[in-house]
């Protein structure tokens, strides 16, 4: 029977279940609550403020879906305008 499976193009139930689970996990990981996203934003800004001056009002941090090798995966995208670099000799 295994000889016939080599020529079969139908995925096994195991592979179908695995693919479905991947899709569910990717979807769940990409859904961040506003509270979690705000915490991430504050921590990123706290670290960056040690090294550069930034405009907090102009910061845009979002979660998007990007195409990866195996479907879509979530990506954290940050647009943070820098006013000045701290400690830079002029």
From Swiss-Prot:
InterPro entries per record: MinE, MinE_sf
Keyword Cell cycle: yes
Coiled coil: none
Pfam entry (one): MinE
GO terms (BP aspect): cell division; regulation of division septum assembly
Keywords: Cell cycle, Cell division
Similarity comment text for this entry: Belongs to the MinE family.
Function according to Swiss-Prot or TrEMBL: Prevents the cell division inhibition by proteins MinC and MinD at internal division sites while permitting inhibition at polar sites. This ensures cell division at the proper site by restricting the formation of a division septum at the midpoint of the long axis of the cell.
HAMAP family: MinE
Designated name of the protein: Cell division topological specificity factor
Protein species of origin: Clostridium perfringens (strain SM101 / Type A)
């Amino acid at each position: 029977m295994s000889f016939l499976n080599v020529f079969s193009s139908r995925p096994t139930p195991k592979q179908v279940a695995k693919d479905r689970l991947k899709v569910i996990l990717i979807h769940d990981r990409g859904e961040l609550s506003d509270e979690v996203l705000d915490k991430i934003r504050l921590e990123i800004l706290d670290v960056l403020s040690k090294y550069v001056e930034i405009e907090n009002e102009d910061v845009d941090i979002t979660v998007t879906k990007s195409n990866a090798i195996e479907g879509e995966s979530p990506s954290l995208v940050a647009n943070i305008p820098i006013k000045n670099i701290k400690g830079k000799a002029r």
